[in-house]
Amino acid sequence: MERKNIYTDEERYWMTGGNTGTLPTRIIPSVIYSLAQNEIFVFGSNAMGMHHLGAARVAYNEFGAEWGNGEGLQGKSYSIPTMEGVVSTRLAVKRFTQYAREHPELKFLVTPVGCGIAGYTTEVMAPMFKDATLLENVFLPISFWKVLVGK
């Protein structure tokens, strides 16, 4: 039996647009167990593609991330290297955004990239995804949306 993804009450509230209908609705679930056919699990890793821990390990174990591949589409996942510094991470996010723009048939579920083992705050990482928010096929964690919309 396939396990269902888990949304918190707050995530479900945002997904309706909130009381005023103005909150972003493209929210990822807190826990991702499964992906639809067109969904891609977006995670942070290192440039060497050593997917030891965190979302990188989940991507490797569950969604086809390739050992030794530090960036790009791999199976049902997309790796963004985050361990090599803010400047290189920002460039990798730009490449991801361009890839998502070129593949509107895919739905990208962006985890809190860079906010785990890489050690960045949401205040540092979320603005890197500002251009991606213009794409209907990119879904972000609620923590990123809160920074981006000032909530």
Tell where the protein language model's regions lie, with residue ranges:
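Macrodomain-like recognition of ADP-ribose-binding/processing modules
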Residues: 1-151
